Structure formats: structure tokens, C-alpha cells
Amino acid sequence: MAPASSNPGPYSLPDKDEVQLSAEDDWTRVKDRKEKKRIQNRVAQRSYRSRMKARLGELQSRLQAHEEQKAKEEAERCDPSPPSPPSSSATGLHLHTTPPSGNNAGANDTEPSSINSASPPTPPDVVGDLDPSQHAKAIDQFSHQMDMAGNDDSQWFLDSTSLLQHGDTSSYIQPSVPTPPVSLSQCPPMPAYMPEGPRNPNDGPASLSQSILQDCLRFQIQLLAKINNPSEATSTTHKEEGSAAKSPGALQQSHWSSCATNPAAAAQNMMPSTNMARGNSFSVLPADFHNLDDMMELTSTGDLPNATWRPSQQFSGPETTPRSHNAENPTQQQSPINDDTPSTTQHGAVPDCYNAFVAKSSAQASSLGMEERLEAAIEGLEALGFTSVDSFAEAYYSSSFDESSHLAAEQSMSRKRRLPRMLSQILDSAQSWDPWDRRGLNEEVLRTAESLLVAEGKSMDEKSLEASISGLMQATEGSSKPTPPQQNVTGMKRVLQNELPNLWPVMMALAGGNRASRQRDRSNMVLAAILILHCSSKMTKQKLLEFLDVCL
């Protein structure tokens, strides 16, 4: 049983003395260690979700209060009644905590040291038109409060590391609020402050709410990154502050252009995938392989050390096109913050977290050899759900696609042209393999050839063959010469070639190895062998011997 604490973590277990647990949630009755941890994980997750729902409800109510206050002030400005004395809320930004302390002191006089660790700092309430300097000052004060709360190990900021103490993360449900990455290298660069530019007077409460939520998400991510990696966070913060002091407008335009209209989608993009939580970096298939056949041919050859990396120009990360599209059409990507969907796009699209792998591959393009390229390709296929390269090739050639799609046309072209050439190169390369390695391949080739020849023999037109044999025998009996006319033998060979298009060339290849001086025409020997296979049970022994004597 987890020890009780006055300041529990995000995933701590509830106190049994304060909460009445059901029989199925009481882990003290279970003796098995794994089952006990499973129950504790379930109870901790349920407690965490309930706290987060309450927190989200509180934030939603506060946002609604901000919107109502803004609408009320706009209505008062439009009212021609005598102006009332300006209130303290209309002169600047107010910083307050939730729940409020007992006194009614001004929010601007709130000290960072007076923040209670049980209640998180909240973003400033923008209730008036302020210049950028005042807004930046308020934001810096709020950032300092966030740092103080982080040093006190506040329970309001998510930390995924404490969850790992209760078991495997694969069985956990994704929280309703996206968990920020544990390192600054996994999240996009963020400015130290974002000055508020001149707003359009026509902007309503919706844009105000998005701005508040945007600042809140940004400071939470920075604080978590600083807690998990203090050295990296300090160096990155200094760099960001210097760049923001030089050109804050450029930083705001470059990074927040797409997030300003859709903060919920931006928060979802920052959430790491399950593979990142397990410690596996996500990777994708390098685009240097122009098709599947090229990659399969490279895996079958032995010239891996001599090959070099050739980065393809057609590969580009998905950050440019989808994000610019989202900026133009923000309504198509709007989603609630408490959505439990994983951080992957629809229609089988690759998640955004593979940009790190793309950057790493591009940076090391000159030093990567063929083995590194193939390893990266295999890692990318495994990350996309394929167990191996073989399963990917099997799915590519055996799947049925829409006839109008580009993939169907590419698959058809590969089946007709590239697949036979690839199989031929693999079989040629197999001659240099170890005997135990190529044994299975040779056996499979023989089984395939056997089934193909058997099916061909069953589908042969026996009536046409019998008619040709009867005509040949009648011509032999009616002729004074011991051998039948040449045109009859040639006609029978043509019939067998049409009926047995695979067996005839195989028999011709086998007969080519026997170069006896008395056998001038190998086709006659092949004709006799095929007739023995297919006609030995349909004629008497005397007839068969006479026919063989005619052919040979």
C-alpha cells in the first residue's frame, strides 16, 4: 500500500481511510503481486482522471467568466450612459490563484512565494487593451510563479515518470490532457515570452480564450521540461530569451502562426506517442528506396559495404504542407482538449514525432552506408506495424487496392516487370549463400514448380492429344516408309507445346544435358517422354512401343 502523503503526486493512490473502495478495487485483499499492482494502477488512473476532469471544469468555468466579463465591458462601452469610474480590473493584468486566499488584496500585489502548491498558478486575465511591455511584464511574473510552483513539486503539473512505478505503460489509458514531452529536444522551440501585438477591436471572446489557453499550455510545457532536465532547460531558456529579445515578432510569427488559431490541435501535436513513452524512438522508411523491389534487391545481395547513401530529393517532412493547410482551414482540425485519441493522424498517416528521425537521417546522410539504411528501413516498417520486411512485401503484393488508386497501378507494374527481375536476381544471389540458407528457398521453388506442372497436366485437352496420336499412327500404317511423314510429327509437337507451355520447355532443358551422338533432334525425345507420361495408360504396350519407335 502506498504511504499517505500531504502532497500526493498526479498518479498517487487515494487514502483508504478517506475513500470507500469497492471490493474489486481493494488491492489489500489480493495476494498476487502482479494483480495487486494492476488494481493499484487502475485506481490511480481513475483518481487521476477525476482530478483532471475537475481541473478542466474549473478552467472552463473561468474561461466562461472571462468571456462574460469581456462581453459586459463591451456592452458598457456601447451604452451611452455616463462613464463610471475606472475599476482596477480595467487598468492592467490581474494575477490570482485558485482557490483564492482568505484576504482580498489586489492581484497585482501577489507575491510568488505566497502561491500554494496545492493550487496551480493561473495565466493572467487579459481584460483590457494593453501595450506589449505591460503584457510582457505580466507574462514574466506569471512565468516566475510557475517556476516557484515547479520547485515545490506542485501536483497540478503532469509527470509521466511517476506512473512508471506502477507497471507497464502499455496498459494505461491516455489522459484527457496531453502530457508534454520529458525533454526539450522532443518539443518545438518556444519563445521566452510572446508579446501581445495590437489586437483587432472586432476580435471577440473566442480569440481571448485561445490566447489564455495558449499561454497556459506553453508555460506548463516549459516548466515540466525544466523539472525533468534542468541543465537542458536552462541553456535552452537563455537562448530563447536572447532570440526573443532581438526579434520577438519573428519568433511569434514563425512558431505561433498555426497554433494561434488552433491551440487544442497544437497541444495534441506536442503529445508524445506510446513508443516514445516506452523509450523507443519512432522511425520511418527512408525515401531513398524508390520502390519495394529496390529495397528487396538490396537485402538479397552481398555488396552492402560498397554501397553509399543517396538521399532522395522527393522526401520531405509532413510539417510544411499539413500545418500550412491547417492554418488556412482551422475549422477542419478543431478538436476538444479532453479527446482521448492517440497522437496519430487519420487514414494511416504517419505521426508527427518521426521528424526527429528525418532530421537525424538527413544530418548523417554522408556517413550512412547500406547496412544503416536497411536498418533504418526495418525500424520504420516495425514502427508502422509490420513485423518484418517480408510481411511488408507479402502485404504489398497480395493486397487488393482500388483500381483507380496510384498504389494499384504501381502494384500491377511491379507484378508484371519488376517482381520477375527481382526474383531472378535473388535466385542468382542465392548461389553464393550458405547451403543451409538456400535450402529452404530451393525447396519452395521445387514445390511451386511441381504444383504448376501438375495443374497444367490436369488442364490439358486429352481429346486433342488423342486425335493427334491417332492421326500419326494412321499415317504410319498407311505409309510404305518406316517413319511417319514429317508434317504429322511437327503438328503433334505443336499441339503439345500449346497444351503444355511449361512442361515442354522444362523437358527440353533436361534433354539438352544429354548430347548423345545418335540423338540429333531433342524434340523427338521430349515428345516420346511426354507421350509416355500422358498416354501409357490409354493404349496397349505394343501400340506404345510402336509409337516410341516412330518418334525415336
Swiss-Prot record:
Residues 64-79 have a biased composition (Basic and acidic residues). Its main location: nucleus. InterPro entries: bZIP_sf, Sec_Metab_Biosynth_Reg. The keyword tRNA-binding does not apply. It comes from the Eukaryota. Residues 31-76 form the bZIP domain. Keywords: DNA-binding, Nucleus, Transcription, Transcription regulation. It is found in: Nucleus. Residues 56-63 are annotated as: Leucine-zipper. The keyword Transcription regulation applies. GO terms for cellular component: nucleus. Residues 31-55 are annotated as: Basic motif. GO terms for molecular function: DNA binding; DNA-binding transcription factor activity. Residues 98-119, 169-186, 298-347 have a biased composition (Polar residues). Residues 1-132, 169-209, 232-258, 297-349 are annotated as: Disordered. Belongs to the bZIP family. Transcription factor that regulates the expression of the gene cluster that mediates the biosynthesis of the lipopeptide antibiotics leucinostatins that show extensive biological activities, including antimalarial, antiviral, antibacterial, antifungal, and antitumor activities, as well as phytotoxic. All 20 genes in the cluster are up-regulated to some extent by lcsF, with the exception of lcsL and lcsP, which are down-regulated. This is Transcription factor lcsF.
